[in-house]
Amino acid sequence: KLLHRDMGPKTRYMGPEVPEEELIWQDPIPEGKSFEVDSAKSLILKSGLTNREMIETAWCSAFSFRGSDLRGGANGARIALEPQVSWESNKPGQLAKVLPILKEIAAESGASLADIIVLAGNVAIENVSGMTVPFTPGRGDASQEQTDVDSFAYLEPIADGFLNYKRDDVDIKPEEILLDKSHLLGLTAPEMTVLVSGFRSLGISTD
Protein backbone atom coordinates (compact mmCIF):
# COMPACT_ATOMS: atom_id res chain seq x y z
CA LYS A 1 0.00 0.00 0.00
CA LEU A 2 1.37 3.39 -1.00
CA LEU A 3 1.65 5.54 2.11
CA HIS A 4 3.70 8.42 0.78
CA ARG A 5 4.81 10.09 -2.43
CA ASP A 6 8.49 9.54 -3.08
CA MET A 7 8.64 11.22 -6.48
CA GLY A 8 9.61 14.84 -6.82
CA PRO A 9 10.82 17.57 -4.47
CA LYS A 10 10.20 17.97 -0.76
CA THR A 11 7.46 20.51 -1.46
CA ARG A 12 5.26 17.60 -2.54
CA TYR A 13 5.12 16.19 0.98
CA MET A 14 1.58 16.05 2.36
CA GLY A 15 0.29 16.06 5.92
CA PRO A 16 1.73 17.20 9.26
CA GLU A 17 4.07 14.26 9.89
CA VAL A 18 6.67 14.80 7.21
CA PRO A 19 10.41 14.22 7.70
CA GLU A 20 12.62 17.22 8.42
CA GLU A 21 15.84 16.02 6.80
CA GLU A 22 16.99 17.31 3.43
CA LEU A 23 17.79 14.49 1.01
CA ILE A 24 20.04 15.14 -1.98
CA TRP A 25 18.10 12.78 -4.24
CA GLN A 26 15.14 15.14 -3.89
CA ASP A 27 17.19 17.91 -5.55
CA PRO A 28 16.73 20.42 -2.69
CA ILE A 29 16.33 24.08 -3.60
CA PRO A 30 16.38 27.01 -1.15
CA GLU A 31 13.48 29.44 -1.13
CA GLY A 32 13.50 32.28 -3.63
CA LYS A 33 13.99 35.98 -2.91
CA SER A 34 11.85 39.07 -3.25
CA PHE A 35 13.23 41.75 -5.55
CA GLU A 36 12.23 44.70 -7.70
CA VAL A 37 11.52 43.13 -11.09
CA ASP A 38 11.55 46.37 -13.10
CA SER A 39 14.94 47.36 -11.70
CA ALA A 40 16.34 43.95 -12.58
CA LYS A 41 14.92 44.22 -16.10
CA SER A 42 16.65 47.57 -16.50
CA LEU A 43 19.98 46.01 -15.54
CA ILE A 44 19.41 43.17 -17.99
CA LEU A 45 18.70 45.62 -20.81
CA LYS A 46 22.01 47.37 -20.08
CA SER A 47 24.00 44.14 -19.83
CA GLY A 48 25.06 43.94 -23.46
CA LEU A 49 23.78 40.38 -23.82
CA THR A 50 22.08 39.58 -27.11
CA ASN A 51 18.48 38.43 -27.33
CA ARG A 52 19.67 35.08 -28.64
CA GLU A 53 22.07 34.56 -25.73
CA MET A 54 19.37 35.33 -23.18
CA ILE A 55 16.70 33.19 -24.85
CA GLU A 56 18.98 30.19 -25.34
CA THR A 57 20.24 30.35 -21.75
CA ALA A 58 16.71 30.56 -20.35
CA TRP A 59 15.55 27.74 -22.60
CA CYS A 60 18.44 25.42 -21.76
CA SER A 61 17.88 26.12 -18.07
CA ALA A 62 14.26 25.02 -18.35
CA PHE A 63 14.75 22.23 -20.90
CA SER A 64 16.07 19.70 -18.37
CA PHE A 65 12.65 19.55 -16.67
CA ARG A 66 10.90 16.18 -16.57
CA GLY A 67 7.22 16.13 -15.71
CA SER A 68 7.49 12.42 -14.96
CA ASP A 69 9.42 12.91 -11.70
CA LEU A 70 9.64 16.72 -11.55
CA ARG A 71 13.43 16.77 -11.79
CA GLY A 72 15.40 19.43 -13.60
CA GLY A 73 14.04 22.74 -14.82
CA ALA A 74 14.87 26.39 -14.26
CA ASN A 75 14.24 26.41 -10.51
CA GLY A 76 17.55 25.92 -8.74
CA ALA A 77 19.66 27.48 -11.53
CA ARG A 78 21.54 24.21 -11.83
CA ILE A 79 22.53 25.19 -15.35
CA ALA A 80 25.30 27.11 -13.55
CA LEU A 81 26.47 23.96 -11.75
CA GLU A 82 28.05 20.67 -12.74
CA PRO A 83 27.13 18.65 -14.67
CA GLN A 84 24.71 20.91 -16.58
CA VAL A 85 27.12 23.79 -17.09
CA SER A 86 29.34 21.42 -19.10
CA TRP A 87 26.66 19.75 -21.23
CA GLU A 88 27.29 20.23 -24.94
CA SER A 89 23.61 20.98 -25.55
CA ASN A 90 23.81 23.93 -23.13
CA LYS A 91 26.60 25.63 -25.10
CA PRO A 92 29.26 25.82 -22.33
CA GLY A 93 31.23 28.46 -24.19
CA GLN A 94 28.22 30.76 -24.32
CA LEU A 95 27.36 30.05 -20.68
CA ALA A 96 30.89 31.10 -19.70
CA LYS A 97 30.02 34.57 -21.01
CA VAL A 98 26.36 34.84 -20.03
CA LEU A 99 26.28 33.40 -16.51
CA PRO A 100 28.82 35.77 -14.87
CA ILE A 101 26.85 38.74 -16.20
CA LEU A 102 23.54 37.37 -14.96
CA LYS A 103 25.09 36.46 -11.59
CA GLU A 104 26.25 40.06 -11.19
CA ILE A 105 22.75 41.31 -12.00
CA ALA A 106 21.25 38.85 -9.51
CA ALA A 107 23.61 40.04 -6.78
CA GLU A 108 22.94 43.72 -7.51
CA SER A 109 19.17 43.31 -7.62
CA GLY A 110 18.92 40.90 -4.68
CA ALA A 111 17.35 38.23 -6.87
CA SER A 112 18.17 34.58 -7.35
CA LEU A 113 20.16 33.62 -10.42
CA ALA A 114 17.34 31.25 -11.36
CA ASP A 115 14.86 34.14 -11.51
CA ILE A 116 17.27 36.38 -13.43
CA ILE A 117 17.91 33.68 -16.05
CA VAL A 118 14.18 33.35 -16.69
CA LEU A 119 13.61 37.11 -16.52
CA ALA A 120 16.37 37.69 -19.07
CA GLY A 121 14.62 35.28 -21.41
CA ASN A 122 11.41 37.25 -20.91
CA VAL A 123 13.19 40.53 -21.63
CA ALA A 124 14.61 39.13 -24.86
CA ILE A 125 11.19 37.94 -26.03
CA GLU A 126 9.74 41.35 -25.18
CA ASN A 127 12.52 43.00 -27.18
CA VAL A 128 11.77 41.05 -30.34
CA SER A 129 7.98 40.89 -30.03
CA GLY A 130 6.99 44.21 -28.53
CA MET A 131 4.68 42.33 -26.17
CA THR A 132 4.71 42.07 -22.38
CA VAL A 133 5.67 38.62 -21.11
CA PRO A 134 4.29 37.72 -17.64
CA PHE A 135 6.89 36.90 -15.00
CA THR A 136 6.43 35.16 -11.66
CA PRO A 137 9.43 35.28 -9.27
CA GLY A 138 10.17 32.85 -6.46
CA ARG A 139 12.84 30.50 -7.81
CA GLY A 140 15.79 29.64 -5.60
CA ASP A 141 19.43 28.83 -6.27
CA ALA A 142 20.73 25.37 -5.44
CA SER A 143 24.36 24.82 -4.48
CA GLN A 144 26.80 22.32 -5.92
CA GLU A 145 26.61 20.44 -2.60
CA GLN A 146 22.84 20.10 -3.07
CA THR A 147 23.30 18.59 -6.52
CA ASP A 148 23.86 14.89 -7.16
CA VAL A 149 26.17 15.07 -10.17
CA ASP A 150 25.92 11.37 -11.00
CA SER A 151 22.12 11.22 -11.06
CA PHE A 152 21.78 14.53 -12.89
CA ALA A 153 24.00 13.16 -15.64
CA TYR A 154 21.06 11.03 -16.75
CA LEU A 155 19.10 14.20 -17.55
CA GLU A 156 21.60 15.31 -20.20
CA PRO A 157 19.76 15.77 -23.51
CA ILE A 158 20.80 13.55 -26.38
CA ALA A 159 18.83 15.86 -28.66
CA ASP A 160 16.88 19.11 -28.54
CA GLY A 161 14.56 19.43 -31.51
CA PHE A 162 13.60 22.94 -30.45
CA LEU A 163 17.18 24.13 -30.96
CA ASN A 164 17.88 21.65 -33.76
CA TYR A 165 20.53 19.85 -31.72
CA LYS A 166 21.36 16.14 -31.78
CA ARG A 167 24.43 14.27 -30.60
CA ASP A 168 26.38 12.58 -33.37
CA ASP A 169 26.20 9.17 -31.69
CA VAL A 170 22.38 9.14 -31.48
CA ASP A 171 20.53 6.93 -33.97
CA ILE A 172 16.98 7.67 -32.81
CA LYS A 173 14.95 9.83 -35.17
CA PRO A 174 15.12 13.44 -33.92
CA GLU A 175 11.40 13.96 -34.45
CA GLU A 176 10.68 11.06 -32.09
CA ILE A 177 12.92 12.59 -29.42
CA LEU A 178 11.20 15.95 -29.96
CA LEU A 179 7.79 14.45 -29.29
CA ASP A 180 9.04 12.53 -26.26
CA LYS A 181 10.65 15.61 -24.73
CA SER A 182 7.59 17.75 -25.45
CA HIS A 183 5.56 15.23 -23.48
CA LEU A 184 8.02 15.36 -20.57
CA LEU A 185 7.81 19.16 -20.61
CA GLY A 186 4.03 18.97 -20.47
CA LEU A 187 3.58 20.78 -23.79
CA THR A 188 0.53 20.48 -26.01
CA ALA A 189 0.97 19.96 -29.75
CA PRO A 190 0.15 23.64 -30.50
CA GLU A 191 2.62 24.80 -27.82
CA MET A 192 5.35 22.60 -29.25
CA THR A 193 4.68 23.93 -32.74
CA VAL A 194 4.75 27.55 -31.62
CA LEU A 195 8.03 27.06 -29.76
CA VAL A 196 9.79 25.37 -32.67
CA SER A 197 8.57 27.90 -35.23
CA GLY A 198 9.22 30.79 -32.84
CA PHE A 199 12.84 29.77 -32.35
CA ARG A 200 13.35 29.41 -36.11
CA SER A 201 11.77 32.80 -36.81
CA LEU A 202 14.31 34.32 -34.40
CA GLY A 203 17.16 32.50 -36.08
CA ILE A 204 17.77 30.35 -33.01
CA SER A 205 19.19 26.99 -34.01
CA THR A 206 22.25 24.92 -33.20
CA ASP A 207 23.10 24.66 -36.90
Locate each region found by the language model.
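Long, well-ordered alpha/beta core segments of mature domains
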Residues: K1-D207
